[in-house]
Amino acid sequence: MNAYYEQDADLKYLQGKNIAVLGFGSQGHAHALNLKESGLNVCVGLRPDSSSCEKARENGLEVNTIADAVAWADIVMVLLPDQYQKSIYESEIKPNLKEGNTLAFAHGFNIHYNQIVPPGTVNVIMIAPKSPGHLVRRTYTQGNGVPCLIAVHQDYTGEARQQALAWAKGLGGTKAGVIETTFKNETETDLFGEQAVLCGGSAELIKAGFETLVEAGYPEELAYFECMHELKLIVDLYYEGGLSRMNYSVSDTAEYGGMTRGPRVITSDVKAEMKKILEEVQDGRFAKEFIDECNAGYPNMKKLRESNADHPIEKVGAKLRDMMSWLLKK
């Protein structure tokens, strides 16, 4: 995959245009502020009763309702939660889109699964920073940026790709590198990674390890330290230099034990189940399940949240984290 940098992008494709950023959460505040400080004309679209209205104004941004922001804008970036985008699109975005506008997203879920079907007379693009919003913002203020993905779903004006690259440049992304992909590939890999590894697989691995030690008679505190707390040390090594950096940094005992026992935990059966999870993402079964869950008021999700909150690892973890002065208390 090719990477694009500063010389490959030109802010002229956004200059002189009205840009609306819908939402002012983690990504929304970073996009709006970075683009504004890149010299672009930005407003934020929010519900009138949103607690973020005051925050956005305190940061020197103009705030409008979502409908008014879209009506004013040439380019609209939708940075709202996936489950709310369809209804807001139908009621406030779609009626105010104009021919030649650009509709932008930071995640492809609603476009890829046809929850949102824009008219053929607009550009549809994606700019997805591969970092949380606070890091997008911080690196920009330091004169750097984070890697970004871009994609073009629909190019009505002939400038969709240039606009996506320009947006990434306005975020600071072209200083790190920008990779072009598709809505399909971004959506499916993102969902799979969340479910099988990052949020689902890792959480279940942690709980299973904790339970194994506790059921064998070891103190919960030791089980927490070994299966939850110390995971950050290992993940940071992965993050900084991959698997080889981790293996180089740990003891020979840990390296040998990990290489010989790890495959007994993540077996061919586990990988087969991962493939099934990927198939559910690819064929839309997961998307339908999630949308149905949202429409029903999250009955299953509420039960799962309660179950996780009641797990013993959460109780002992809260107690041990109170001993850690370096952690921010919330």
From Swiss-Prot:
Question: What reaction gets catalysed by this protein?
Answer: (2R)-2,3-dihydroxy-3-methylbutanoate + NADP(+) = (2S)-2-acetolactate + NADPH + H(+); (2R,3R)-2,3-dihydroxy-3-methylpentanoate + NADP(+) = (S)-2-ethyl-2-hydroxy-3-oxobutanoate + NADPH + H(+)
Annotated EC:
1.1.1.86
- Single GO BP term: isoleucine biosynthetic process
Pathway per its UniProt entry is: Amino-acid biosynthesis; L-isoleucine biosynthesis; L-isoleucine from 2-oxobutanoate: step 2/4; Amino-acid biosynthesis; L-valine biosynthesis; L-valine from pyruvate: step 2/4
| Cofactor(s) needed | Mg(2+)
- Domain of life according to the entry: Bacteria
Q: Which residues of this UniProt protein bind NADP(+)? A: 24-27, 47, 50, 52, 82-85, 133
The protein's GO terms of the molecular function aspect are:
ketol-acid reductoisomerase activity; magnesium ion binding; NADP binding
The KARI C-terminal knotted domain, residue ranges: 182-327
Residues that hold Mg(2+) 1 according to the record: 190, 194
Q: Where is the KARI N-terminal Rossmann domain?
A: 1-181
Example GO CC term: the record gives: cytosol
Q: How is the cofactor bound?
A: Binds 2 magnesium ions per subunit.
Q: Which Pfam families match?
A: KARI_C, KARI_N
Quote the InterPro entries the UniProt record gives.
6-PGluconate_DH-like_C_sf, KARI, KARI_C, KARI_N, KARI_prok, NAD(P)-bd_dom_sf
What job does the chain carry out? Involved in the biosynthesis of branched-chain amino acids (BCAA). Catalyzes an alkyl-migration followed by a ketol-acid reduction of (S)-2-acetolactate (S2AL) to yield (R)-2,3-dihydroxy-isovalerate. In the isomerase reaction, S2AL is rearranged via a Mg-dependent methyl migration to produce 3-hydroxy-3-methyl-2-ketobutyrate (HMKB). In the reductase reaction, this 2-ketoacid undergoes a metal-dependent reduction by NADPH to yield (R)-2,3-dihydroxy-isovalerate.
Q: What is this protein called?
A: Ketol-acid reductoisomerase (NADP(+))
Protein's organism? Chlorobium phaeobacteroides (strain BS1)
Q: What is the lineage of its organism?
A: Bacteria, Pseudomonadati, Chlorobiota, Chlorobiia, Chlorobiales
What is this protein's gene name?
Answer: ilvC
